[in-house]
């Protein structure tokens, strides 16, 4: 019995010391919770909220939430969002998947230790290759938007149009993208062209 306990503790220690343990636990838990315990969201464009709180492990040297933690929290919230609106299920049905192809973050005010917040995630639209999502970090103390993150979720194995059609059982036209999002997409395309030219891969497209 003692040997089993020692082995279990050793495995747990190795899991959290050698791997990003909490992330590997939280994302599947968020997906399972969204799938089994939360109601389905039928409106693809509806905003969803994911609650969080700044913990000591989230802090940087200035005692603010570490910039990288915003991306992680948004990752967990995005997984739950795509589960509840059915996108992950549709991708599975179509033998397809998505990868994160681009992201950007704008930080407006720091989140401090033990400050409660919500991640407001919404799908802004899609094109022939990717879904575009926005995540807002809203302080529950005063409702201030502390950070705004944007993501390009590239679809592999099918197209966003087919995913949406599979979900809605009909053809759905993508919504008009916001002007600032169009500028960001244009920036990504220009950056890709420059990098391909530098690498001599001008005929190859990025994800």
Swiss-Prot record:
GO cellular component: extracellular region
CDD domains: 4HBT (cd00586)
Phosphoserine, modified sites: 199
Pfam families: 4HBT_2 (PF13279)
Keyword Signal part of the UniProt annotation: yes
Glycosylated residues, chain numbering: 188
Phosphoprotein is among the record's keywords: yes
Keywords: Glycoprotein, Phosphoprotein, Secreted, Signal
Leader peptide range in chain numbering: 1-21
Location, primary (coarse class): secreted
InterPro entries: HotDog_dom_sf, THEM6_lcsJ_thioesterase
Subcellular location: Secreted
Family: Belongs to the THEM6 family.
Protein name (database record): Protein THEM6
């Amino acid at each position: 019995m003692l040997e089993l306990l020692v082995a279990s503790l050793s495995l747990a220690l190795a899991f959290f010391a050698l791997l990003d343990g909490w992330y590997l636990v939280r994302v599947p838990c968020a997906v399972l919770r969204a799938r089994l315990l939360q109601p389905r969201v039928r409106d693809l464009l509806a905003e969803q909220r994911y609650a969080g709180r700044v913990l000591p492990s989230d802090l940087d040297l200035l005692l603010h939430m570490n910039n990288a933690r915003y991306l992680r929290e948004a990752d967990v919230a995005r997984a739950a969002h795509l589960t509840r609106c059915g996108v992950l299920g549709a991708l599975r049905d179509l033998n397809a998947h998505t990868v994160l192809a681009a992201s950007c973050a704008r930080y407006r005010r720091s989140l401090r230790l033990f400050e409660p917040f919500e991640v407001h995630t919404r799908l802004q639209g899609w094109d022939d290759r990717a879904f575009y999502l926005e995540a807002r970090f809203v302080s529950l103390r005063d409702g201030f938007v502390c950070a705004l993150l944007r993501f390009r979720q590239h679809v592999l194995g099918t197209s966003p149009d087919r995913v949406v059609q599979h979900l809605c059982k009909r053809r759905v036209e993508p919504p008009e993208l916001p002007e600032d999002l169009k500028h960001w997409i244009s920036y990504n395309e220009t950056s890709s062209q420059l990098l391909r030219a530098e690498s001599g891969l001008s005929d190859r497209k990025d994800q």
